[in-house]
Amino acid sequence: MKTGIHPDYQDMKATCSCGNVIVVRSTLKKDLNLDVCSACHPFYTGKQRNVDTGGRVDKFNKRFSALSTKK
């Protein structure tokens, strides 16, 4: 490998909107602002909300059940 052609690899702070600070190594020269991180994302915190699609499935089956009985 050639020497002196690669950018500097240094510590960088990624700051989330919840206040969590993550230190990572990168060639990016400025700090990074995040909207969500593993500390505040609903999937990781267990506050995930399941959307009930049962009504949509029943509506679809009701609409197209007439087509399957005609055959």
Swiss-Prot record:
Its cofactor is Zn(2+). One of its GO terms (cellular component) is ribonucleoprotein complex. Keywords: Metal-binding, Ribonucleoprotein, Ribosomal protein, RNA-binding, rRNA-binding, Zinc. It comes from the Bacteria. The keyword Transcription regulation does not apply. One of its GO terms (biological process) is translation. InterPro entries: Ribosomal_bL28/bL31-like_sf, Ribosomal_bL31, Ribosomal_bL31_A, Ribosomal_bL31_sf. One of its GO terms (molecular function) is metal ion binding. Binds 1 zinc ion per subunit. Part of the 50S ribosomal subunit. Belongs to the bacterial ribosomal protein bL31 family. Type A subfamily. This is Large ribosomal subunit protein bL31. The gene is rpmE.
